[in-house]
A protein has these predicted regions:
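Bacterial N-terminal signal peptides that target proteins for export
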Residues: 2-12
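Short linear motifs centered on Gly/Pro in flexible linkers and helix caps
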Residues: 1-2, 25
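Glycine/tyrosine- and acidic-biased, solvent-exposed loop/turn segments at the edges of beta-strands
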Residues: 24-115
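Bacterial N-terminal signal peptides
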Residues: 11-22
Length: 115
């Protein structure tokens, strides 16, 4: 029984590591930015902020074309203008409003939908 418990714990740990690797590999490059507008880069070369040329999906958040977007230095979404209504951690966020996240991915703020 102890062997089964150990195998289960090991498989959970491996699954968690795999999930973390998948989410951290995802980082935006300058191709998502509107040409002719200011693109700010982090020291590591990843996009810090720019104006989007097209809608952009980041971890189930759809950011609006023409809107501003910003990323943390590890490539995680910091903020953007929502292209469509979104529900994040039970908060209903309004399209065309700014949404922002903490570096750990938790919702920081958004424009709430009208009830």
């Amino acid at each position: 029984m102890k062997i089964i418990d150990n195998l289960f714990s090991l498989s959970l740990a491996l699954a968690l590591i795999l999930i973390l690797v998948i989410f951290n590999v995802y980082a935006a490059d300058q191709s998502i930015c509107n040409s002719g507008t200011t693109v700010v880069l982090h020291d590591n070369g990843l996009v810090k902020s720019c104006q989007l040329k097209d809608d952009y999906d980041a971890n189930n958040i759809r950011c609006k074309n023409g809107g501003s977007v910003s990323f943390y230095s590890d490539g995680k979404l910091e903020s953007c203008v929502l292209s469509a209504d979104a529900t994040v951690a039970e908060s209903k966020c309004k399209a065309d409003g700014l949404i922002s996240f903490y570096i750990d991915g938790k919702l920081k703020s958004c424009m709430k939908q009208d009830n």
